[in-house]
Curated annotation (Swiss-Prot):
InterPro entries in the record: Chaperonin_Cpn60_CS, Cpn60/GroEL, Cpn60/GroEL/TCP-1, GroEL-like_apical_dom_sf, GROEL-like_equatorial_sf, TCP-1-like_intermed_sf
Protein name (Swiss-Prot/TrEMBL): Chaperonin GroEL 2
Subunit record text: Forms a cylinder of 14 subunits composed of two heptameric rings stacked back-to-back. Interacts with the co-chaperonin GroES.
Organism of provenance: Nitrobacter hamburgensis (strain DSM 10229 / NCIMB 13809 / X14)
Keyword Isomerase belongs to the record: yes
Length: 546
């Protein structure tokens, strides 16, 4: 085990505070509509330009081990806020820095760190309660667009795209962000359920121009196993032919005699049919087939359930108004499933999302949820250069998470005003002793830091702006740093999702309180290089000097 360097008390806190300041100072320049860019060097390719706090925080690694520990703790604040609400990372970092700074001064003055922490916790509870009390539900499309615009640093085009996407796929739908190959930003929405499996044979194609299968009012057979023998399929095919409706077969695979017969019947025009492979693998495939069955009002044919293919009736098949199959994807629109069954399945998947600890499983469950509950929207972000596209994509990602959070928990005035107003409530908190009172006071001072920083980034005097905002009693009154005017921020469309502001203060206070109560730090000593003998000068072979 290698030797360790240990620092105590003031020494430890000073080093840690230096690390906190380096990271926070780099992150906080991005705050607000007039926040600056940060350029990140990449080991290959062009440098990356971003205004996303967590992206900047993740790039910072300091040489001094003790300073680095402080920086990494604050990086955790940004990461936790990004995970919880998807935005508000810079606000959280600014708050954490302010709490740690004031807290370190109080500890140096001889106050009890544990009582300071209790005071901080009391203050955060009061702030969260105030935010929830003043939160306003998001109802209109315009409000969603405003949230997106603010989070995308004042880019109204992004706000409109997101509002449109949310309107089309609903709150449960999935919105993904990709890089476009063109200059324009586009929105592509897939309504209904889509999975990434195409037709098994191109002979099933009905629309030769677009090379895809299009079927209206189709029956859907959902079979878990492979289909190779025709005999077990024959009774069902005859029943479907009698109805004159098309049939889509979803199975593990269709091959041999079964595939040949289906293709021949399709080409002769006797039976409108198409076959696709089932999506997913293993247990996930079973779950996805069950999703398709519930969406279409059919039954997944599985030997586990004791159902054999030859005994399947028309009543066991799913139905959909439209099915489209191309080379790579299958889309089922307007399945005939009962609303109550679909809602029950959605609730079940939501419960699984809450329980799972794996990020991969959570992502897959959310995809399944979207396919059942809404749809999938893809925003393709365009730009003139790769650097511009990447920077814009970061902002769209932030804005997307912010709009989701706004729909979930509502909105409060932006520009750091909600936290400023909450700071006024902290004067009423009763504490057990003076040290706890100082803990509350630390948070009260810190709550003005985001509004102050937004003003500083806009070239204004932060203290003057904060003073003017607090002079007015009106909750939504604040400073619009984009236009340089004061007024009602909610009516100006300057709003923050309550969830984002709440997560920012909770995460900032949690990590800052830990830093304040730190009394010792342990880090590995830097290894001394045991260098070998130096190379001879010139690097030539012996006896070849000129």
């Amino acid at each position: 085990m290698s030797a360790k360097d240990v620092k105590f008390g003031v020494d430890a806190r000073d080093k840690m505070l230096r690390g906190v300041d380096i990271l926070a100072n780099a992150v906080k320049v991005t705050l607000g509509p007039k926040g600056r860019n940060v350029v990140l060097e990449k080991s290959f390719g062009a440098p990356r330009i971003t205004k996303d706090g967590v992206t900047v925080a993740k790039e910072i690694e300091l040489e001094d081990k003790f300073e680095n520990m402080g920086a990494q703790m604050v990086r955790e604040v940004a990461s936790k806020s990004a995970d919880a609400a998807g935005d508000g990372t810079t606000t959280a970092t600014v708050l954490a820095q302010a709490i740690v700074r004031e807290g370190a001064k109080s500890v140096a003055a001889g106050m009890n760190p544990m009582d300071l922490k209790r005071g901080i916790d009391l203050a955060v509870e009061a702030v969260v309660a105030d935010l929830v009390r003043n939160s306003k539900k998001v109802t209109s499309n315009d409000e969603i667009a405003q949230v997106g615009t603010i989070s995308a640093n004042g880019d109204s085009e992004i706000g409109k795209f997101l509002a449109n996407a949310m309107k089309r796929v609903g709150n449960e739908g999935v919105i993904t962000v990709e890089e476009a190959k063109s200059l324009e930003t586009e929105l592509d929405v897939v309504e209904g359920m889509q999975f990434d499996r195409g037709y098994i044979s191109p002979y099933f194609v009905t629309n030769a121009d677009k090379m895809r299968v299009e079927m209206d009012d189709a029956y859907i057979l959902i079979n878990e196993k492979k289909l190779s023998s025709l005999n077990e399929l024959l009774p069902l095919l005859e029943a479907v032919v009698q109805t004159g409706k098309p049939l889509v077969i979803v199975a593990e695979d269709v091959e041999g005699e079964a595939l040949a017969t289906l293709v021949v019947n399709r080409l002769r025009g006797g039976l409108k049919v198409a076959a696709v492979k089932a999506p997913g693998f293993g247990d996930r495939r079973k779950a996805m087939l069950q999703d398709i069955a519930i969406l279409t009002g059919g039954q997944a044919i599985s030997e586990d359930l004791g159902i054999k293919l030859e005994n399947v009736t028309l009543a066991m098949l799913g139905k959909a108004k439209k099915v489209m199959i191309d080379k790579e994807n299958t889309t089922i629109v307007n399945g005939a499933g009962k609303k109550a069954d679909i809602e029950a399945r959605v609730a079940q998947i939501k419960a699984q999302i809450e329980e799972t600890t794996s990020d991969y499983d959570r992502e897959k469950l959310q995809e399944r949820l979207a396919k059942l509950a809404g749809g999938v929207a893809v925003i393709r972000v365009g730009g003139a250069t790769e650097v511009e596209v990447k920077e814009r994509k970061d902002r769209v990602d932030d804005a997307m998470h912010a709009t989701r959070a706004a729909v979930e928990e509502g909105i409060v005035p932006g520009g750091g005003v909600a936290l400023l107003r909450a700071s006024e409530q902290l004067k009423r908190i009763k504490t057990a002793n003076d040290d706890q009172k100082t803990g509350v006071e630390i948070v009260r001072k810190a709550l003005s830091a985001p509004a102050r920083q937004i003003a500083i980034n806009a070239g204004e005097d932060g203290s003057v702006i904060v003073g003017k905002i607090l002079e007015k009693e009106q909750y939504s009154y604040g400073f619009d740093s984009q236009s340089g005017e004061y007024g009602n921020l909610i009516s100006k469309g300057i709003i923050d999702p309550t969830k984002v502001v709440r997560a920012a203060i909770q995460n900032a206070a949690s990590v800052a309180a830990l830093l304040i109560t730190t009394e010792a730090m342990v880090a590995e000593l830097p290894k001394k290089n045991a260098g070998g003998p130096a190379m001879p000068a010139g690097g030539g072979m012996g006896g070849m000097d000129f």
